[in-house]
Regions:
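Canonical Rossmann dinucleotide-binding motif of NAD(H)/NADP(H)-dependent dehydrogenases/reductases
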Residues: 1-16
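Active-site-adjacent segment of SDR/Rossmann-fold oxidoreductases
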Residues: 12, 127, 148-159
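The beta1-alpha1 cofactor-binding region of Rossmann-like NAD(H)/NADP(H)-dependent oxidoreductases
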Residues: 42-52, 84
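Substrate-binding pocket helix/loop in short-chain dehydrogenase/reductase
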Residues: 78-79, 83-91
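Active-site loop immediately N-terminal to the catalytic Tyr-X3-Lys motif
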Residues: 80, 129-133
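Active-site helix of classical SDR
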Residues: 102, 138
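Residue(s) in the substrate-gating loop at a strand-loop-helix junction
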Residues: 122
Length: 172
């Protein structure tokens, strides 16, 4: 989902910064859209890496007006077979990674009194689904987070949105 979102944004003339743990496919886009595209190899579980990449993006582009959190991790096991460490790991990427990202970008948006944050979620965060309890739980938590942040930052003209893409075949 993310790669094609990036391609479309760049093709439409937007400046794009990407924080991703896997960057090999991004080199192709960098060669084509050099001045409008930067990327950083970042593990969203690492506060310092996230903050450093966001700070560099703001310095390079001068503004962060739209931010999309699209990272996710999903495991496929029954709930009884899923240990707590798996839950913690999936939450650390999907939910706490989103929170780290927001905490890094929000100062730039509040300074400009403008911004839009989009979280990629899933219908299973609302309905639930078998054999992906950690993933579904994180998406439900993201839904609640977006609602809370939408209220808290309305005064700063910063909006928070949830995107529910259709079922896709992706590596997560």
């Amino acid at each position: 989902i993310g790669y094609y979102m990036i391609k479309k944004l760049l093709a439409d003339g937007n400046r794009v910064s990407v924080l991703d743990i896997e960057t090999q496919n991004l080199e192709i886009l960098k060669n084509k859209y050099n001045s409008n595209f930067i990327f950083y190899k970042v593990d969203l579980r690492n506060n310092e890496e996230v903050k450093m990449a966001v700070d560099k993006t703001a310095k390079e582009f001068g503004i962060i007006d739209i931010a999309v959190h699209n990272a996710c991790k999903c495991t496929f096991k029954s709930e009884i077979e899923t240990d707590f460490d798996t839950y913690k790991d999936v939450f650390d990427v999907n939910y706490f990674g989103a929170l780290r990202f927001v905490k890094s970008i929000i100062p730039y948006m509040t300074a400009k009194k403008k911004g839009k944050v989009i979280f990629t979620s899933s219908g299973v965060g609302v309905t639930g689904f078998m054999n992906i309890s950690p993933y579904s739980s994180t998406k439900g938590a993201l839904e609640a987070l977006a609602k809370c942040l939408r209220i808290e930052y309305a005064k700063d003209n910063i909006t928070f949105h949830i995107m529910h893409p259709p079922l896709t075949q992706t590596k997560s």
